[in-house]
Design a protein with these regions (language model features):
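Active-site histidine-acidic residue metal-binding/catalytic motifs
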Residues: 113-198, 204
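A short, glycine/acidic-enriched catalytic loop
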Residues: 131-154, 217-245, 250
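Soluble non-cytosolic domains of exported or imported proteins
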Residues: 157-165, 191-195, 238-246, 299-307
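Mature extracellular/periplasmic domains of secretome proteins
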Residues: 194-207, 272-278
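Active-site-adjacent mobile loop/cap segments within catalytic or ligand-binding domains
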Residues: 211-219, 228-231, 263-322
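Active-site-adjacent substrate-binding region
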Residues: 240-268
């Protein structure tokens, strides 16, 4: 009986140790065993590290003939990453930075930098393009070339002004992050049809075409953001569905995460002329409802606009390199 009781106590002690004591990170244990004079490669837990005089390297470094990059914990990076606001690719197996190559259709220059192109389209304008245009290539259905957009129910601010403000701020942030940015408009004095805007994106061969809008509804209680893309069975550009959907999801998720606004959904529809005529990855971001007094006021706050801009930028980047 005493023997059974003793075994039970030992078993209980072992269980307590397992549940109470912190898990041992054997990678850290192995790393701690590296000599203070060691310089070279080490692999722990399937991850590669480079040591110089016993210390893990972090950031971008030239080792021998090649450049490598290491995360803050020293892990060797692979794939696409934005390093010091420049987009670079590191081989999946070797971790070597690529130069003078094309990877996934993306041209990398002699300095190891790929510069993604983003076209920003601040929706609407003070001067509205009159008349009608085909809904999509080859379509007999016509739709207005543009509309005046909506207006803030509480602030009175026209949508085209908000769209342009966000677009210009977004351009600045994206350029700082290493993007090339093309704008469909930088003022509100020009009338542009939806096809005109799509042509700008097509000519630039954009890696992402972001159409910036704000929403409106007869129901003033509705709030939140949504994105819009073409459908899987689009009669105009079905080949772009996968990329359009992925871009729409990435932008919406990042925008909601940055702003904390209500998340609606990705609306798949072939009723948007600008989307139908675009030959590059495209989404419309409806940033919020100007028909909701609270959301309307919020979207005019500079602090909130910074969150809006950061969210869209993060979404574009997530789509391109993750």
């Amino acid at each position: 009986m005493k023997k059974r009781k003793s075994c039970f106590i030992w078993l209980l002690c072992i269980l307590l140790l397992v549940t109470v004591l912190p898990a041992v990170d054997f990678t850290d244990v192995q790393a701690a065993s590296v000599s203070s004079t060691f310089t070279g490669w080490k692999t722990f837990g399937g991850k590669k590290y480079y040591y110089k005089n016993g210390k893990k390297l972090t950031d971008l470094h030239k080792i021998g003939k090649y450049y490598y990059c290491f995360a803050a914990d020293g892990t060797m990076l692979t794939g696409w990453h934005r390093i010091h606001n420049r987009f670079r690719y590191f081989g999946k197996q070797t971790g070597r930075m690529r130069i003078n190559q094309t990877v996934n259709g993306r041209k990398i220059n002699s300095k190891g930098v790929w510069t993604p192109v983003v076209v920003l389209d601040p929706g609407h304008s003070a001067v509205v393009a009159g008349g009608y245009e085909p809904l999509g290539p080859g379509s007999s259905q016509l739709k207005e070339k543009d509309t005046s957009g909506t207006q803030g129910v509480a602030t009175g601010v026209e949508e085209y002004k908000l769209n342009l403000s966000i677009g210009l701020q977004l351009r600045t942030l994206l350029q700082k992050r290493g993007f090339k940015v093309v704008m469909t408009r930088t003022n509100s004095k020009v009338a542009l049809s939806c096809i005109d805007r799509a042509k700008v994106a097509n000519k630039a061969n954009a890696d992402a075409y972001i159409r910036i809008h704000a929403n409106g509804s007869d129901n003033s209680s509705i709030s939140g953001a949504l994105t819009i893309c073409t459908t899987r069975n689009s009669p105009y550009i079905s080949s772009m569905y996968r990329k359009n959907k992925a871009l729409s999801e990435a932008v919406l998720n990042a925008y909601v995460a940055a702003t904390g606004c209500r998340k609606e959904y990705v609306w798949e529809t072939d009723s948007m002329t600008g989307n139908n005529w675009s030959k590059v990855p495209t989404t419309i971001i409806e940033m919020g409802y100007m028909s909701n007094p609270s959301e309307d006021r919020r979207m005019q706050q500079s602090s909130y606009q910074k969150k809006m801009v950061r969210g869209i930028a993060n979404g574009i980047e997530n789509y391109l390199i993750k």
